[in-house]
């Protein structure tokens, strides 16, 4: 069985592929780069994940499509960037260096927001909510979180998003310093995907003949 992921983000696709259960394959939704993106205007991760799953499922008739909404919640910033994590620098009108990537600008914007606060080790969490839909109907959801701290300088090159700043004290490493399999054992996305599959797979089993 193949489940289609409504993302073209290579980092997310790599995480999902590594977390897939036995007999469950994952693949990017065909043609997703050409599909107009929906407005992610819900105030919660759950709302945006459901919105996207329903929307993209209409582009894959009869197939199961998974969408995620995930981000970083920093306690010292009142939970920001939150659902705006991917657009944090844009929202703050922060440009950064001209050659910086979107991820790099978001990271620099976060550090600038924290630099005026006397919080030596800002606590934070990654949060992910996944929703699975087929033909416009939600089949299951799953959520996962992981707690950590925000460093003042980035470390590691294996991750994406805020991974170079997100420090796991129990590992003495940032998310960006972990290999894919180790990361999945701790990551919000790996935990959310496991919860989603636990809720979804029983629904897909053929009924037993009495």
Where do the language-model regions lie?
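Anionic-ligand binding patches
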Residues: 2-4, 10-28, 32-210
């Amino acid at each position: 069985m193949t489940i289609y992921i409504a993302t073209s983000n290579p980092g997310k696709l790599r995480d999902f592929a590594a977390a897939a259960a036995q007999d469950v394959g994952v693949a990017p939704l065909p043609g997703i780069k050409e599909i107009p993106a929906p407005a992610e205007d819900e105030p919660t991760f759950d709302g945006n994940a459901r919105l996207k799953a329903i929307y993209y499922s209409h582009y894959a008739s009869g197939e199961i499509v998974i969408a995620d909404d995930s981000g970083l919640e920093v306690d010292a910033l009142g939970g920001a960037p939150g659902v705006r994590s991917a657009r944090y620098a844009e929202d703050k009108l922060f440009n950064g260096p001209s050659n910086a990537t979107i991820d790099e600008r978001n990271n620099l914007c976060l550090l600038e927001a924290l630099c005026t606060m006397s919080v030596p080790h800002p606590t934070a969490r990654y949060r992910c909510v996944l929703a699975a839909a087929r033909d416009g109907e939600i089949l299951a959801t799953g959520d996962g979180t992981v707690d950590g701290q925000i460093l003042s300088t980035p470390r590691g090159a294996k991750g994406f998003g805020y991974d170079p700043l997100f420090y796991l004290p129990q590992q003495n490493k940032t998310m960006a310093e972990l290999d894919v399999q180790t990361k999945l054992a701790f990551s919000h996305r790996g935990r959310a995907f496991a919860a989603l599959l636990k809720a979804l797979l029983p629904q897909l089993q053929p009924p037993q003949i009495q």
